[in-house]
Amino acid sequence: MSKIIGIDLGTTNSAVAVLEGTESKIIANPEGNRTTPSVVSFKNGEIIVGDAAKRQAVTNPETVISIKSKMGTSEKVSANGKEYTPQEISAMILQYLKGYAEDYLGEKVEKAVITVPAYFNDAQRQATKDAGKIAGLEVERIVNEPTAAALAYGMDKTDKDEKILVFDLGGGTFDVSILELGDGVFDVLATAGDNKLGGDDFDQKIIDFLVAEFKKENGIDLSQDKMALQRLKDAAEKAKKDLSGVTQTQISLPFITAGSAGPLHLEMSLSRAKFDDLTRDLVERTKTPVRQALSDAGLSLSEIDEVILVGGSTRIPAVVEAVKAETGKEPNKSVNPDEVVAMGAAIQGGVITGDVKDVVLLDVTPLSLGIETMGGVFTKLIDRNTTIPTSKSQVFSTAADNQPAVDIHVLQGERPMAADNKTLGRFQLTDIPAAPRGIPQIEVTFDIDKNGIVSVKAKDLGTQKEQHIVIKSNDGLSEEEIDRMMKDAEANAEADAKRKEEVDLKNEVDQAIFATEKTIKETEGKGFDTERDAAQSALDELKAAQESGNLDDMKAKLEALNEKAQALAVKMYEQAAAAQQAAQGAEGAQANDSANNDDVVDGEFTEK
């Protein structure tokens, strides 16, 4: 069976891992980094992903960041003269991760386990699955991020019974899960969280502070300047990271904008104490989900054996202190918070292929599921923190005499009224025989699969007629749309590879022309006429090929120029080496003269 890769598709950074033997290994990206920025940019029709995309975010307005926060919504992003769904942008990130995983493994990768925040609802999970499909991946399992982290932490502790609390504060989401580990069973007891809390919010607090201070000083609102705002974002992220290690950092952004008197610069120092003050409310918000999860699990703090920190934002000292204060425990630092989720996903991939034995993962649904009943009430069929996969049925009836159909309004959430919860979908059961209200028996069955994705069935027990749907939110993609996007992604992958090859060649040509012109200039009048003329001739031919835009011709002429330029460089090197040797010889002779002069003795002369 081919390898199943594990992917942590994060808000700010993503990672990919694979199981090698019994070890889960993070695969480094082409730049040698173990995590990849979840950033996509478009330039001259080319799709750029990861580190290169993040580097040009300041100067390129066609850059998309934090797309994960839009998953499961109908929001689209405009770039490259097109409108893209969050699933398509996420698919570009997944495609990039898949590509360098294939390069590392030396084989095609077609299957993946992808992680999502535990508090993702059905629409967000479905959107993640669709993104995988568009990227050419069969998503074998959607796993909750804290659960994946627990898998990676507990893999070598399967002989030990433990209750652990996973505190996962990422770039855009926050989850807390409580698990029981024992005999290879990873049983999620409860999960809670906040889908709108993460490292991005901590960055935003710094940005708001810098904008306010600059406005106070200069009367200019930097938040209205797109390019200045992107520079502020980069500076805020860097300052936040710096303050995890030092107590004060300097933020320096020269030429941030211009005033009536000329260019203006932003120079400010930020202390850790000030940062803690700015973000105090965010740290406070992490406490409620911790208490909620403990309450749902029916556990007291004294029953928790270990606290595991996951996500880059758990490096913030105030967050670590809050976790200690809230749990009364020193967090376990045996796992890398940036990598552990992808590693756990790869382990789950190994469980599916059978490479990892005697491990059972029992996850839960994070939110209650049910339907709208008379008076707009939300009637729960499946409570939150129910172990999945699961199925639950309940019998309902009609609200009016001779009612021919019932509308099934499927919802997810915890509020008592339907209007306050998230709509997952609606469907109708029709052709109900005429009968007084309360007589027809309508059985509604909810099924949640191992990925946390919901399907609902309504059945008239009198006629045995039934209606069945897999929930697709209003913001979800149809099969046709997914197929079209898959084809686009495949076509783009080929076109992108070709375009990248072209860009690389053109850059190489530019570099070779610049370097050769410099060498020819430097060797003027130094007696290498034959080599200089040959290099000049090859240079002119390459320039002509560059002008024509013929790639094959450019490739051939580039090789020819490299050969001639190399010959000229060798001559230069030989001359330089000879000159150095001659200089060393002269120094030696001078040293000998100096040594001979040492025999002369100074004496005093006295007049008589």
Swiss-Prot record:
This is Chaperone protein DnaK. Keywords: ATP-binding, Chaperone, Nucleotide-binding, Phosphoprotein, Stress response. One of its GO terms (molecular function) is ATP-dependent protein folding chaperone. It holds the Pfam family HSP70. Signal peptide: none annotated. The modification Phosphothreonine is found at T173. Acts as a chaperone. Residues 599-608 have a biased composition (Acidic residues). The lineage of its organism: Bacteria, Bacillati, Bacillota, Bacilli, Lactobacillales. InterPro entries: ATPase_NBD, Chaperone_DnaK, Heat_shock_70_CS, HSP70_C_sf, HSP70_peptide-bd_sf, Hsp_70_fam. Induction: By stress conditions e.g. heat shock. Belongs to the heat shock protein 70 family. CDD domains: ASKHA_NBD_HSP70_DnaK-like. Gene3D superfamilies: 1.20.1270.10, 3.30.420.40, Actin, Chain A, domain 4, Substrate Binding Domain Of DNAk, Chain A, domain 1.
